[in-house]
Amino acid sequence: MGGAVRAGRRARRDARLRRHLPHPARDRIQDPGARFDGAGALAGPRADTRADRTGPPVSQIYDNPIGHWVVVVVAMTLLLFVVLTATAYTVWFERVALGRIQRRPGPNRVGPFGLLQLAADGIKLAFKESFVPGKTDKVLYVLAPTIAVGAAFLAWAVIPIGLWGNAQYWIADVNVGILLVFAVSSLNVYAIVIGGYSSNNKYSLLGGLRSAAQLISYEMALGLSLVPTFMIVGSLRLRDIAEYTVHWGPYTGPIPLILLTPIGFVIYIIAAVAETNRAPFDLPEAEQELIGGFLTEYSGLKFVMYYLAEYVNMITVSALAALLFFGGWYLWVIPPVFAFLIKVILFLFLYIWLRGTFPRLRYDMLMRLGWKGLLPLAVANVVVTAIILVAVQG
């Protein structure tokens, strides 16, 4: 009987103490036999600690499957914002540079230096009617621009941007990153062919077929132009290729791989311009011959998606050129991210200069250059590089 009375008194005392405890500690009391000290705090192994109140460390959150996907979604959102911003100002930079090349002012009315011109154009296109021609395959007609813009952005998941302190600016560091970029980028040909076929327009169809022939013709030369780089570095990981430039030979500074594979660089630049359907290789959308090519029947946001995919692809091949031939984010004392941006901007200017300088090639000249010019030269470059590596390495 005495034991029961003492237990009842203990329970009533614990209940009174529980009402005066802070909520985190009070919530931890699960059994009436928990012991308290004179200050009303839990005593023994059940005591509330600072680690319990602050929660698990970040590493445990990332290791958790849900936390891992949260980090991935946040990273992809930030990357999407950065690439969209870069694309918008690439269009502005191109229009200003072409204006200077052609001795005209370019966009200078909306905002300071015309910086808000792209926002005005985007709002205008967003409110335009998205006209769908009659007798079209509506599913494919809508799917085609979605494939184009999705493939363009997906390639950036494996492209490293650089370092900033201890932070590493890339999402996925895979050991076959360059192959993944090529595989995703090759989906662009399906988007163009499907868009041309589903539009029920002869000019759109001809533009789509031209694009398919052009991309297939130059993809092989583009891939073979990079094989000597892979042979020298011994890796397909983009980060390894960028870091190789600071560890090559007896040098301590960045040694760009263009000095080792200059022919591969020239082939890459020409093939990359053709792969992105840019002037002077913009045959799929030749206005004088095909009105607008595969874009003839597209308007509104669907046209914007194709337009956006073209410029994202242009930034992608410029970033790859900086990584594969010019040391990526290594540029002496310049911070890595800024060094990478400087190199990408220089390649973008090269694209714009080519558009403002050279006329469009004829279709037969384009095919002859791809099959009889670049492809044999790329194969010979691979063979010569292999012979030199065997001779040097023994």
Roles of regions detected by a PLM:
Residues 1, 5-22, 26-29, 35, ...:
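Cationic, amphipathic, low-complexity alpha-helical segments enriched
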Residues 40-42, 46-57:
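Short, Lys/Arg-enriched N-terminal segments with co-localized hydrophobic residues
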Residues 52-394:
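Selective transmembrane helix interface/packing segments
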